[in-house]
């Protein structure tokens, strides 16, 4: 079965100010994933609290809100087969010190004493992805299009994208 999914990715403020946007996007595209929605925004407190509502009341909540609202972010809708799982694996463990080399967080995340800068958010489930995408994107901001190589990977040679 062709499990094409969509997931939300946020390139966080630390990655934006360190000039890592292109590198991170490139990794997803090289993996064969498709960016079907993308924009740069500055997340305000209200949106941050909606996004991270499941963490409200936890000791790290305020630091998380401060972190995600500190500078602009790039939000993306990424599409592909098993996109949620694939993107999570590419992102690596939440804590950069636990993230394997070769993952985005393993290569670019920083653990600075009492703060971690893990450069990227990736939805943790299909349900979370749907909820998170709807927070950042209107339906008309997500695009259907064919990549140049899509025809090559189709099961039938004459299949159209």
From Swiss-Prot:
GO terms for biological process: CTP biosynthetic process; GTP biosynthetic process; UTP biosynthetic process. The keyword Transmembrane does not apply. It catalyses: a 2'-deoxyribonucleoside 5'-diphosphate + ATP = a 2'-deoxyribonucleoside 5'-triphosphate + ADP; a ribonucleoside 5'-diphosphate + ATP = a ribonucleoside 5'-triphosphate + ADP. SMART domains: NDK. It is found in: Cytoplasm. ATP binds at residues 12, 60, 88, 94, 105. The active site is at 121 (pros-phosphohistidine intermediate). SUPFAM superfamilies: Nucleoside diphosphate kinase, NDK. Its EC number is 2.7.4.6. Major role in the synthesis of nucleoside triphosphates other than ATP. The ATP gamma phosphate is transferred to the NDP beta phosphate via a ping-pong mechanism, using a phosphorylated active-site intermediate. Pfam families: NDK. GO terms for molecular function: ATP binding; metal ion binding; nucleoside diphosphate kinase activity. Its main location: cytoplasm. It comes from Pyrococcus furiosus (strain ATCC 43587 / DSM 3638 / JCM 8422 / Vc1). Keywords: ATP-binding, Cytoplasm, Kinase, Magnesium, Metal-binding, Nucleotide metabolism, Nucleotide-binding, Phosphoprotein, Transferase. This is Nucleoside diphosphate kinase. Its cofactor is Mg(2+). It is an enzyme of class 2 (transferase). Belongs to the NDK family. InterPro entries: NDK-like_dom (IPR034907), NDK-like_dom_sf (IPR036850), Nucleoside_diP_kinase (IPR001564), Nucleoside_diP_kinase_AS (IPR023005).
